[in-house]
Amino acid sequence: MKKITATIAIILASIFMLHAQGYVPSEDNLRNRKEFSEARFGIFIHWGIYSMLGDGEWAMHNLPMTFEEYSHLAAGFYPSRFDAKEWVRLFKEAGAKYMTITSRHHDGFSMFATKASPYNIVDATPFRRDVLKELSEACAEEGLKLNFYYSHLDWSRNDYYPRGNTGRAAGRPEEGDWNSYLNFMNAQLTELLTNYGPIGCIWFDGVWDKGGSHEEIEKTWKLSEQYRMIHSIQPGVMIGNNHHLGVFEGEDMQMFEQDLPGQNTAGHSANSVVSETLPLETCVTMNGNWGYQVRDKAYKSVADLIRLLVKAASNNANLLLNIGPRPDGTIPEEAAQRLKAMGKWLEKYGETIYGTTGGFMKEQSWGVTTRKDNRLYIHVLNPSETILVPFSGSRLLSAVSFDDGSKVRFTQLPEGIVLTLPERQEGQTDQIITLTFRQLQ
């Protein structure tokens, strides 16, 4: 641990002057941003010893339980049916281009082999396997990008002090060394960026636990130093932080929890300012919980999930769709069925999602748009006979049904394009019309 801490100190000192004038992303980083933006669909995994309680990832806080009580779960955690290759094959079948998994959640338990704490899946459980290592190898084999979620807040450690607003019932003494905690996190991040190959993104969460302004958060968490350290180890790795604010210097993407960019239906994004330059991502639960909740059967329908994916793409954002695996390491069948159905839809309609940007207009009463090259894809999510596409910036060459290539009647007016839609297929979630222009700018 001392050796790791000393190494981190040297890294931070050596790169301080390099970044003194502000963060400049590397060519690899810019390339990763582009690939990330084109991916449009990823899988989020919340998995840890909390899955044994079947009560979601916040079980320790919500029940509540002391850390001493909760930590005994590790001794019984044995996900005998976990198969990294099976997971990755399923995610590929779903049409996902990357996955993001909890390396450590708020309960403080690490799902990887770490020398920074014995409270981890290899040293504290009878399973004694590094699931992140197995997933990194499976992802590399299948060409799926791997990202790591990492919690800034911690309900288990004494050095997470002063305490935040959550985890107050953990039974910790009212004392601790905050700098020790920061060093612990940086030691773990160094391991994650050193032992698991190229990582797409470090996905942070939890700085909101202590509250504060943009400046106060930076001062408390020393984010700029942490970000510089991360980029010094893997210059290409992206950094995102679920702080629900505008982006901080050193961040490479922006995420929105349970909402599309610019919306605040979930109540997390009131103070969020949408970046106009960075890749965007919407993370959404498939049911009502992030971690495994045995009673939660309120899964979104396949149609609703497809609408979410389409609307995210129309907002220049990826959809990061969450699943909470069971304690035995399997993906709930309800989730697997929906993933496979989304994969079949993307096999046919992926051209209108992957590698697209949002169209030139906000959501309309009939639906949304995506764009690629000189084509504008009209996603008619709400059944209509005639629609107005409020865009008149270029000459329209053709309008055809994406399903069969048949021509669609159109009239180009000063206020936009009027489309007379063909008969909608029974049960069709998204009727797509391809508009091809002479050029689009």
Regions found by a protein language model. Give the residues of each.
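Bacterial Sec-dependent N-terminal signal peptides
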Residues: 1-22
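Mature catalytic domains of secreted/periplasmic carbohydrate-active enzymes
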Residues: 21-441
